[in-house]
Amino acid sequence: MSWRSNAQRTGMNAQPLQGARRWGGAGGAGEGPSSSGSPPSSYHQPSHPYQSSYSHQSQPYNAAPAPPTSSSSSSSNPRDAALAAAAAVAASIGIKRDRDRSSDAPGSNSYAAPSLLTSASTADGSGADAGPRKRKSRWGDANDKITIPTAIGANVSAQELDKYAIQVRLDEISRKLRSGDFVPPDRERSPSPPPTYDNQGRRTNTREVRYRKKLEDERVALVDRQLKLDPNFRPPSDYHAIKRNQRPTEKVYLPIKEFPEIKFFGLLVGPRGNTLKTMERQSGAKISIRGKGSVKTGKGKMDADEDEEEMHCVVTADDEASVKKCIKLINQVIETAASTPEGENDHKRNQLRELAALNGTLRDDENQLCKNCGNKGHRAFECPEQRNWTAHIICHRCGGQGHLARDCTQGRAGAFNGAPPGAAGTGNRQFDSEYANLMAELGEPAAAVDGAATAAGGAVGGAAVGPDGKKIPPWRNPEVWSQPGFGAPRGGDAGRGGWGHRGGYNNRGDRAGYNQHQQQQHPHAYHQQQQAYPAYDQSAPTAAPGGAENADQQHRDYSAEWAAYYAAQAAAGGAQGADPSAAAAGTTAAAEGAVDYSKEWEEYYRMQAAAAAQDGSAYAAGTQA
């Protein structure tokens, strides 16, 4: 019968092995026969080598060897060998327990060997659960406790000392708050403040409340300091709740009564609340405006206490530094509004600018680039570097700067359309004459305008001042009428009527001349005039080129002709049914010595003839060329 393992035995052959091997033992009972079919001989080896080797391994490093037990006898009973092995294992466990206990005691460096009594008790099984055993694991003990050392070494830094002192004080405060023993003795207490009560009539500042709050505030401050020193510090469980309920709060009252015309609410809130949000973001605090006028009527409901107070700002933050910074920002806005006029307040100007940008009505002139220099802050017409284009304009007639040739007020080099050179500067003389007339009408003496009169009429030769010393009006002064270039256009028919029988002062050519007008209205009188004055034909052809010189040399008196002319005009008017009273009035006025302008008219027509002759000579020269 071959040897099989216990798991392979079935049926009738399922019998227990004789001397089955156990953990910590050396074999089975050993009463079975030692015939063929027995297990290998190694199961019946004496247990002395194994027992002795395990005993040696279980001994501590500096402990004495265990004394021999009863199982180390020369008996070959397997049961005794198993009991001896179990006793050895129990002894090793006891040795480990003793070693752990001895390690907890300070100054112990050796381990005591177990006694025979301990070995015997463990062998009997009565000492297996003799005491509580510490549960060990690879992650450490189940209830590790970190204690504060009571001894301070010499090489400890100042930061470590602060951390140690703060931790000791925190433990002391926590113990007092848990036990309720936080009220000091009578000799150590300070005088009590006046009592305060809430809305229900309960006192809010009792001795217990005051000292508890004092300790809680101190603990919160110490925890904040400890967190700064040691980021790994774990604050107490109720720290966050206490700090949330004890956030520092301050009130800043607005000077509404002192400055009733200033809107502090708008200056603090800003457009759509952006100013208030900016201050909260900069300081890290929360700002709430409370009091009278802070809430519109019907928009919200305030507490009774807040409604009775003046308008103020409630500043709340996590720490005192944030509260102080926020209060400083609020005071800056108040001081600026109280000390600066409204038109010069940059804070309000920026708010209005921001509001316009939010509404989409901003005209950004400050950020707009100047088209002249490319800088910001001004427009092109306000540019300080703008080039003076007017100073670079040069007149090609007079050579002056700042005006064009068409706007030139100086004398021209040549006459327009062949005018004589002597007619240059008539424009200036005309302006001077008008100025002199204005001064004369204002009552200035003749001597004051003598220079102007001389400048106005001296060049042409006409008298600018009458015999009585008064200035001749411009409509009566022939020198004013004689403008340069007054004559026929190129290729036209020249004549005393000017521009092809469409003459007249300041005539643009769209009205008939004097002769044509007289022919159309008074044909009978015109024929009579032609018969009476054959030598002075107003519709005569163009004079010879030398006519101008002859006219200048001759000084004929045309007073008789003018008298006959006026008589013929009066007769013609009477023949056509004119009013006899008007004719009589005219005759009476002439008889009474009315002012006679015959010489002025004579001079006027003389100049017209000279101008016409000059134009005719220029035209003839151009035709021959």
Curated annotation (Swiss-Prot):
Comp. bias (Low complexity): 32-61, 70-91, 110-130, 516-533
Q: Where in the cell is it found?
A: Nucleus
User: Per its UniProt record, what PROSITE patterns does this chain match?
Assistant: KH_TYPE_1 (PS50084), ZF_CCHC (PS50158)
Residue ranges constituting the KH domain according to the UniProt record: 253-330
Mark out the compositionally biased spans (Basic and acidic residues).
Answer: 177-190
Q: Name one GO biological process term.
A: mRNA cis splicing, via spliceosome
Sorted keywords for this record are: Metal-binding, mRNA processing, mRNA splicing, Nucleus, Repeat, RNA-binding, Spliceosome, Zinc, Zinc-finger
State the GO CC annotations.
Answer: commitment complex; cytosol; nucleus; U2-type prespliceosome
Keyword Metal-binding among UniProt keywords: yes
Q: Name one GO molecular function term.
A: zinc ion binding
Q: Where are the zinc fingers (CCHC-type)?
A: 368-385, 393-410
Q: What does this protein do?
A: Necessary for the splicing of pre-mRNA. Has a role in the recognition of the branch site (5'-UACUAAC-3'), the pyrimidine tract and the 3'-splice site at the 3'-end of introns.
Q: Which family does the record claim for this protein?
A: Belongs to the BBP/SF1 family.
Q: What is this protein called?
A: Branchpoint-bridging protein
Source organism per entry reads Mycosarcoma maydis
